[in-house]
């Protein structure tokens, strides 16, 4: 085959990448030079001067193209190495960076980098190492990237600047190699690389991203101890966010004040974080004052700020103010996003303002916000809670699917719970089957709602069947589901089954909670086992499970039903001395006990106490008192007639 110069455009190449032409042909050094020479006669006469030219000089660009052609055709191996040697081109840092930036396989770049490092009178510097590190990160070769970074920090000829160290930390952070990033950081410090605020910020932000908030505080303390390295706005923003996530609200507020004392202007993000903290600790007025301070400081609130604002006001029950801020935000020219609108709908739904909620939903399109599964869940939940007709709820569910929004596990849970509470158990059971068909995992909340509804409908066998199914599919069942099942076993007189479930809970290790104890005590009282129920109450508190008012009311009701007021009065005094406030059920239970026992003076005294405490008489209890008084009057009339 005839070998021709690369300048002959119409001639066939002497080298082919096709498999049947992959055999290497012996070439002279002159032929290789001819193939990749620059079409510039003057420059070819001065090969030693070409690297002194400006980066913008066309000849330099052409020189780079020769290397690119060699690497692309030969890949890497003896041919490529020989071609580079024959061309007698000087390998310098700019050339290495250029070759690493071209579009060739990562393995070619790695091999070229190693080859260049072995050249006489050449050593890699920080710029060539960093170029390779970026290539390795892009190729997701994180192990090779870390080994290269280790070379950088250990190489005595390479000077690692604070800016380079920041980039190394960020690269390892993005690769989720946090411990290795910290190791590199401290190795570089040991080599007298003095980190700046920016370097420390890179470490802090990496730790934050991985949720290592306690470590953030340690790095901040170390930074302050440097003496001449001071926190900046980025540092304060990261620290305040970390403290907020750790629940160290006082520390976050202190840092905010410290920042202002140091004449630093808080950012929108910092103000927004502080707003959330004040609302979380119940300091609503302080949060509103901070919002006004933010505006006075010339820091414009963002949609995230307004989201935090309406969430906090909604939680505090100040819904009108939250809705007012929505209108203010629109007047200020800010466009709400889907997260803001979902939060606003949630606030309106919780207080039953369904019409306004649906209006906000209909406005989403105007703001170019596509309703999400959260949007639909919020509407459906609000409709159930406002006692809307089931057909209206079903129409929203149909609309959701028509809009190609896939229902979530929570959607089904809301619907199943709502249908159960509206006595549409069969519809709820069909939805449970639909969940299974769609591949959703067993949802304990949905099962709990169904088990409870079936129990109320006295379909105890069906409830027990679902309970067993949940245990088989889900493994460990929540205490709340156990409590529901124990309650229904007690109601239908299957106390031994209820006790077995209670003991099963104890064997699981988590231990029964207050709901489970209350359910079993209620079953015992129903079965006339009042003393056993009272013993269980004492055992419950001995086991570290704090009784609530319902626990005491169950026992009080048991004593009241026995017709022995003394024990009921003792329980009432126990409740008051335990620090738990009696409720309306407590007073009405004792009042009924007094009425049945004919203790009218005590009943009258109890009624006055109830009135002082703001409790109303139960209609049934009040009627029984009147009946009892009437019976006494009849008895007196009968006696006087003799």
UniProtKB/Swiss-Prot annotation:
The keyword Repeat applies. Belongs to the PPR family. P subfamily. InterPro entries: Pentatricopeptide_rpt, TPR-like_helical_dom_sf. PROSITE patterns: PPR. This is Pentatricopeptide repeat-containing protein At3g16010. PPR repeats lie at residues 125-159, 161-195, 196-230, 232-266, 267-301, 302-336, 337-371, 372-407, 408-442, 443-473, 478-512, 513-547, 548-582, 583-617. It comes from Arabidopsis thaliana (Mouse-ear cress). Keywords: Repeat. One of its GO terms (cellular component) is mitochondrion. GO terms for biological process: Group II intron splicing; mitochondrial respiratory chain complex I assembly; mitochondrial RNA processing. PANTHER family: OS03G0856100 PROTEIN (PTHR47447), PENTACOTRIPEPTIDE-REPEAT REGION OF PRORP DOMAIN-CONTAINING PROTEIN (PTHR47447:SF28).
């Amino acid at each position: 085959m005839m070998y021709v110069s690369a300048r002959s455009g119409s001639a066939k190449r002497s080298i082919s990448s096709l498999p049947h032409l992959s055999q290497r042909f012996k070439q002279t050094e002159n032929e290789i030079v001819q193939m990749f020479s620059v079409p510039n006669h003057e420059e070819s006469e001065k090969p030693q001067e070409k690297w002194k030219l400006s980066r913008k000089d066309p000849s330099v660009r052409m020189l780079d193209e020769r290397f690119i052609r060699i690497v692309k055709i030969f890949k890497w191996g003896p041919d490529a190495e020989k071609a580079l040697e024959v061309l007698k081109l000087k390998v310098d840092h700019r050339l290495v960076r250029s070759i690493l930036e071209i579009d060739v396989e990562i393995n070619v770049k790695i091999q070229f980098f190693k080859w260049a490092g072995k050249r006489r009178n050449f050593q890699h510097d920080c710029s060539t190492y960093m170029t390779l590190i970026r290539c390795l990160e892009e190729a997701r070769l994180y192990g090779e990237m870390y080994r290269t970074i280790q070379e950088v920090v250990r190489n005595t000829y390479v000077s690692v600047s604070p800016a380079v160290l920041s980039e190394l930390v960020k690269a390892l952070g993005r690769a989720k190699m946090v411990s290795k990033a910290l190791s590199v950081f401290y190795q570089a410090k040991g080599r007298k690389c003095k980190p700046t605020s920016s370097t420390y910020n890179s470490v802090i932000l990496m730790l934050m991203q991985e949720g290592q908030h306690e470590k953030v505080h340690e790095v901040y303390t170390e930074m302050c101890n440097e003496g001449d390295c001071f926190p900046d706005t980025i540092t304060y923003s990261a620290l305040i966010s970390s403290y907020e996530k750790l629940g160290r609200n006082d520390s976050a507020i202190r840092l905010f004040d410290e920042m202002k004392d140091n004449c630093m202007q808080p950012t929108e993000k910092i103000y927004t974080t502080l707003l959330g903290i004040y609302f979380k600790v119940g300091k609503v007025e302080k949060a509103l004052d901070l919002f006004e301070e933010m505006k006075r400081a010339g820091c414009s609130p963002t949609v995230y700020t307004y989201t935090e604002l309406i969430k906090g006001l909604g939680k505090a029950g100040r819904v009108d103010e939250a809705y007012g801020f929505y209108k203010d935000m629109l007047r200020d020219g800010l466009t709400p996003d889907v997260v803001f609108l979902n939060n606003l709908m949630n606030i309106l739904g919780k207080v039953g303002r369904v019409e306004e909620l649906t209006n906000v939903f209909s406005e989403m399109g105007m703001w170019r916000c596509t309703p999400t599964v959260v949007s639909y869940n919020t509407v459906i939940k609000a409709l159930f809670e406002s006692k809307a007709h089931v057909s209206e709820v079903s129409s929203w569910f149909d609309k959701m699917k028509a809009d190609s929004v896939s229902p979530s596990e929570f959607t089904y849970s809301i619907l199943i719970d709502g249908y159960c509470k509206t006595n549409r158990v069969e519809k709820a059971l069909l939805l449970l089957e639909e969940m299974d068909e769609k591949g959703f995992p067993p949802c304990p909340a949905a099962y709990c709602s169904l088990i409870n509804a079936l129990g109320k409908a006295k379909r105890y066998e069906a409830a027990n069947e679902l309970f067993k199914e949940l245990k088989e599919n889900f493994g460990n069942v929540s205490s709340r589901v156990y409590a529901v099942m124990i309650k229904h076993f007690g109601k239908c007189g299957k106390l031994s089954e209820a006790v077995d479930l209670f003991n099963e809970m104890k064997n699981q290790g988590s231990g029964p909670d207050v709901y489970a104890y209350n359910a079993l005590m209620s079953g015992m009282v129903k079965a006339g086992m009042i003393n056993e129920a009272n013993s269980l109450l004492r055992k419950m508190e001995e086991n570290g499970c704090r009784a609530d008012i319902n626990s005491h009311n169950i026992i009080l009701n048991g004593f009241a039903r026995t017709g022995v007021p003394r024990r009921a009065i003792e329980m009432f005094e126990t409740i008051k001395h335990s620090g738990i406030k009696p409720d309306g059920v407590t007073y009405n239970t004792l009042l009924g006990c007094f009425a049945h026992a004919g203790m009218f003076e005590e009943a009258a005294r109890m009624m006055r106490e109830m009135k002082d405490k703001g409790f109303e008489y139960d209609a049934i209890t009040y009627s029984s008192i009147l009946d009892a008084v009437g019976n006494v009057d009849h008895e007196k009339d009968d006696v006087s007639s003799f």
